[in-house]
Amino acid sequence: MTSTVVNCVKNLRLAKGWTQEELAQTTGVSRQSINSIERNRYVPSLELALKFAQVFGCGTDEIFKLESER
């Protein structure tokens, strides 16, 4: 059994009315990185996950979840 990390970054970003570029500037990464994270093509570092939690005002467990695959 394997696990996949899924996230709510796009939903949280849209709820704040931010563009990918605005979130990228706020967190110090490129817009392309934000795009890759939102599309589940890239799992961010712990440091970036904590930055997301800080800017969104929630815990990392509310942003990132493990989904089990069989």
Protein language model annotation of sequence segments:
Residues L14, Q25, Q54:
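Alpha-helical residues within the helix-turn-helix
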Residues L14, G28, R39, S68:
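Residue-level detection of the helix-turn-helix DNA-binding "recognition helix"
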Residues F64-R70:
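Short, charged recognition helix plus adjacent turn
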